Structures are given as C-alpha cells and as structure tokens.
C-alpha cells in the first residue's frame, strides 16, 4: 500500500498579544520571560505574570519551545514568521475577499493612492506571474 503524503499541519492561531511575544522571539531567541517582558516594556504595560501566561499559551499551541535553564525556561519560536504571515494573509483574503486578489488590490488602491514605485512593482509581479 502506497504511503499517503501527510497533510500540512493546521495553521497555529495566535492572538494579537501572543503575536507581540512572537515578534520578540523571532527577532532574538532563546529568551526568558523576563527578557521578553523587558523587550515589550516600551510598547506594553504588561506584568511578568501576563508575559508568562502568553508564553504558556504559545507553548501549549506548539508555537514555541521551552528549554530549562537553571530555575527558568528559555523560549524559542517553532512557528516560522513567514508561515504565520502567509497564514494570516491568506485568511484575510479568504474572509474579506472570498479568496480573490483582484478585489483586494482594488480595495486598497481605492483607499490609498499607489505610488509610481508600487504600480511598477505590481506590474512586475503580474508579468512574472504570466511568465511562469
């Protein structure tokens, strides 16, 4: 019997607060909860207990790993930023634009005037897509 290819794992859903912790870990890892709190101190007025709760949720979801370091744990991302961005982007397109790119581009170009550089980049993307 032929072995079936395993389906990709479902995307990991993370909250906006958890995403802030992930951004810190994507920039530098491993880090302890105290280091994460320090990195977020200028953006958030979160207590260390809040950081530990968010870290625990991320660990439970499989987004980060934890390695014992004496009396504390050091955390590293398992979820790649690129994978998370891709999942978030596709989810947005699916939810708001029924998976279609044309209405997405039309909406954003109506909301904000595209610069000449942005138009050039979009044209290049279309040309590259047509050539593939």
Positions of PLM-derived features:
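Short, cationic-aromatic polyanion-contact patches
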Residues: 13-17, 69-88
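Short capping segments at the starts of secondary-structure elements
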Residues: 14, 26-32
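Hydrophobic residues on short alpha-helical segments
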Residues: 19-25, 105
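Short acidic, hydrophobic short linear motifs in intrinsically disordered regions
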Residues: 31-39
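Short helix-coil junctions and helix-kink-helix linkers
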Residues: 38-46
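Short, hydrophobic-biased segments on the C-terminal half of alpha helices
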Residues: 52-56
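Glycine-centered, phosphate/nucleic-acid-interacting loop/turn motifs that mediate DNA/RNA or nucleotide
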Residues: 62
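Amphipathic alpha-helical dimerization/coiled-coil segments
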Residues: 86-130
């Amino acid at each position: 019997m032929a072995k079936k290819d395993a389906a990709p794992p479902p995307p990991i859903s993370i909250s906006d607060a958890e995403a802030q912790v992930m951004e810190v870990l994507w920039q530098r890892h491993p880090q302890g909860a105290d280091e994460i709190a320090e990195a977020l101190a200028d953006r958030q007025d979160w207590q260390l207990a809040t950081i530990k709760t968010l870290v625990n949720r991320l660990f439970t979801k499989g987004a980060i790993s934890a390695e014992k370091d004496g009396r504390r744990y050091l955390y590293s991302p398992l979820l790649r930023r690129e994978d998370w961005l891709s999942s978030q982007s596709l989810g947005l397109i699916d939810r708001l634009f029924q998976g279609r790119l044309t209405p997405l581009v039309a909406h954003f170009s109506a909301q904000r005037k595209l610069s000449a550089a942005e138009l050039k980049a979009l044209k290049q993307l279309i040309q590259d897509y047509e050539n593939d």
